[in-house]
Amino acid sequence: MAQAKKKSTAKKKTTSKKRTNSRKKKNDNPIRYVIAILVVVLMVLGVFQLGIIGRLIDSFFNYLFGYSRYLTYILVLLATGFITYSKRIPKTRRTAGSIVLQIALLFVSQLVFHFNSGIKAEREPVLSYVYQSYQHSHFPNFGGGVLGFYLLELSVPLISLFGVCIITILLLCSSVILLTNHQHREVAKVVLENIKAWFGSFNEKMSERNQEKQLKREEKARLKEEQKARQNEQPQIKDVSDFTEVPQERDIPIYGHTENESKSQSQPSRKKRVFDAENSSNNIVNHHQADQQEQLTEQTHNSVESENTIEEAGEVTNVSYVVPPLTLLNQPAKQKATSKAEVQRKGQVLENTLKDFGVNAKVTQIKIGPAVTQYEIQPAQGVKVSKIVNLHNDIALALAAKDVRIEAPIPGRSAVGIEVPNEKISLVSLKEVLDEKFPSNNKLEVGLGRDISGDPITVPLNEMPHLLVAGSTGSGKSVCINGIITSILLNAKPHEVKLMLIDPKMVELNVYNGIPHLLIPVVTNPHKAAQALEKIVAEMERRYDLFQHSSTRNIKGYNELIRKQNQELDEKQPELPYIVVIVDELADLMMVAGKEVENAIQRITQMARAAGIHLIVATQRPSVDVITGIIKNNIPSRIAFAVSSQTDSRTIIGTGGAEKLLGKGDMLYVGNGDSSQTRIQGAFLSDQEVQDVVNYVVEQQQANYVKEMEPDAPVDKSEMKSEDALYDEAYLFVVEQQKASTSLLQRQFRIGYNRASRLMDDLERNQVIGPQKGSKPRQVLIDLNNDEV
C-alpha cells in the first residue's frame, strides 16, 4: 500500500511539473516580445517624427490628444514594458490613476489653448487630418486634440468654465494620489501643513514690512521736526547771506559794465580790424587785395594766422549768376499704376493667410508706393506681434512675392506694416521730387526720392549733419550721390556752397570737374585724398578761430554779423560758404591710408557742423574694417541700399532690413535722432541730365580753385636721394616685381636685415610702397608703365 501511495504521489508531482512547464512555455511565447518591440519602435518613431510612419503616428496622436500626446507616449511605453516583463496587467489603482491623469492633461491643454487663442479645433475626420498634416508637414496647435475639445464642449454647458477648472485641479490631485499609493488623509495633511507654513511665513513678512513702515514714518516725522526747527532759526542766517551776497551780485555786473563801457569806444575799431584781417587774408588766396595786409596789427596776425592755417577763398558774389532751372531735368514719363483691385485682392489673401495660421487681424489701410505696397494690419486683442513677424516666409509664399518686409509695429501707431513688392517698380525722377520743394530757402536741401505713401522726401544736409551711404554694387548708391550733388547745384550759387569731391574710382565724379562750386579739382589719388581731408580739418580749425574772435558760435551767426557789417561799412566782405565733402568710395581710402582717413573723418564729424562743413561718405563694401566703430558712431544719418546679408545691414543702420530691399534705388533712410527707418524709392537721374546741369553752370562761371586747399603734389622720385647706393636698383626691382618685402631685398641683393629694412623705410617714405599692414604684403604704389620709371 505504501509503495502504491508513493507511486501515485510521484505521478501527481510529475503531472504538476509538466503543467507548470507548459504554462511557462505559453508565457514565454516570443510573439509577446515581438509585439512589445514593435510597439516601442512605433512610439519612438512617433515621438521624434522619423520618416513617413513617424509623421503619420504623431499626426494621429496629435489629432486625438493634442499636446497631451507626449504623456500618452510615456504611458504606452510604461504599460508595454510592465506587461512584457511582469506578464500581468498593472494594478487597477495605477491604471485608473494614469487614465485620470490623461483626462486631466486633456482638460489642461485644451483650457490653455482656449484662453490663448479662443479658436476651436476643426471637426474634420481623423484620416483626412492625418493625411493633410503628413502631406504639408505642418502640425497646428490643437490644444487637447479632438478628445479635449469634446470634453470641454460637453463640460462647459453643464458646470461652466470655472467649474471645469476646479474639476481639472481635483483630477490632477486624484491622479497623484492614485499613482503614488498614498491615503487621502496623508495627502490632505501634507497640503494643510504646507498651507499653514506658507501663511506663517507670509504673516512674518507682513509684520516685518509693517515694522519697517512704522520706522520710516517715525524717521519722516523726526526730519520734519528738524526742518521746522531750522526754519525758526533761518531768518538770522538769511539776513547775513543777503548782506554778504547782494554786494557781490551788484559788484559783478557793475564791474563788467564798466569794462564794457571802457572798451566800448575801442570795440568797433577792434571788430573792424578782425574782420578786415580775415577779409584780407581771404583775398590773399585769390590775390585780389594783398595791399590790405599791411593795415593789420601784429596782435591780429598772431591770433588768427598760424603755421598750418589754410586761407579759404572769400569769393565775391557773382550777381549775374543764375541757378539752373528744373527744366534741364527730364519730365517723368507716365507709367501704368498698380491696379487697386489687385491690391485689394492681395489684402484679402493676406487676411485669410493670417487667419489660417491662427492670427486674427484686419487690413485697415493700404499704401501704394513706387516700389512696394504697405498693408497696415491691426491685430486682434491678445495677438502677439512676434507671431506675425515669424510668418514672413508664409506670407511671401501666399502672396507670391519675392520677399516681404514687416515693420512691427509702425512707429507711433498700434498697427503692423507688411511691405510687399510691386510687380513693376515705378520710376521716380529727381524733377518730380524737387518740383514741390524748390526753390528752397535752405541751400543744402537735397532730394532723395519718394516714400511708401508716394510723398517726395527732401532732407537738409545741415541738419543731418553728416551722411553715410552704403550698399552693394548696382543698388543705386552712385545715382543717389549724383542726385545730392545736382540738388545742391540747382539750389545754391558758388559763393554759397563749396564742394570737395573725392573719387578713388576715377569715373563717377569726374563729370563735375570745372564747375565753380569746387574748391579743388576732383581728387582721384587715394594719398591725395587723405591729404585733402587733412586740409578740411585745418579749414575747420581756421573757421573756429574766426568764430572765437568775432564772438559768434557758428557759421550762421558769423555770416549774419558779416551782413550787418557790410551794411555799415563801405568795404564789402564775403561770407563763409558751406563746404560739402563727398567721398564716393571709402574702402579704397581705408586700404591705402586707413588711420589717417579715419582720424580726419573723426575730427570732421565731431566738430565741423558748427563750422558749416558737412561730410558724405559712400562705400559699396559695408564691412566693419571699412565702416569702423569710430566712423559709424560719429555719422548719425545713414542710407542703406540693398545688401547681401543681415550682418551688412546691421553694420550700416544698426538693425536688419536692408537685406530685404529690392535694389534699383530702394533704400532705408535713418535721419539724425530717428529711431526707425524710412523706406524710400530713390530718385533717378540720367547721365545726360547731369551733363546738362554741369554745362549750364560752367557756361556762367569758371572754376576758381583754392590753391592752398589742394593736396601736396607727389614727390618727384628722380630728385629723391637715399644714403644707400642700392636704392635705385631696389626701386627698379620693386616696381618691376610689383611686390616688396625685407626678405625679398635680402635675397636679391645679398644684404643684411638692417640694410634691407632701411631700404624698405626709404621706399615707403618716398611713396613707392605702402605702409605695413600686419601679415598682408605691402602695396606697390608705382606702376611699371609710369613715365618716372
UniProtKB/Swiss-Prot annotation:
One of its GO terms (cellular component) is plasma membrane. SMART domains: AAA (SM00382), Ftsk_gamma (SM00843). One of its GO terms (biological process) is chromosome segregation. Essential cell division protein that coordinates cell division and chromosome segregation. The N-terminus is involved in assembly of the cell-division machinery. The C-terminus functions as a DNA motor that moves dsDNA in an ATP-dependent manner towards the dif recombination site, which is located within the replication terminus region. Required for activation of the Xer recombinase, allowing activation of chromosome unlinking by recombination. PANTHER family: DNA TRANSLOCASE FTSK, SPORULATION PROTEIN RELATED. Consists of an N-terminal domain, which is sufficient for the localization to the septal ring and is required for cell division, followed by a linker domain, and a C-terminal domain, which forms the translocation motor involved in chromosome segregation. The C-terminal domain can be further subdivided into alpha, beta and gamma subdomains. The alpha and beta subdomains form the DNA pump, and the gamma subdomain is a regulatory subdomain. This is DNA translocase FtsK. It comes from Staphylococcus aureus (strain MSSA476). The lineage of its organism: Bacteria, Bacillati, Bacillota, Bacilli, Bacillales. The gene is ftsK.
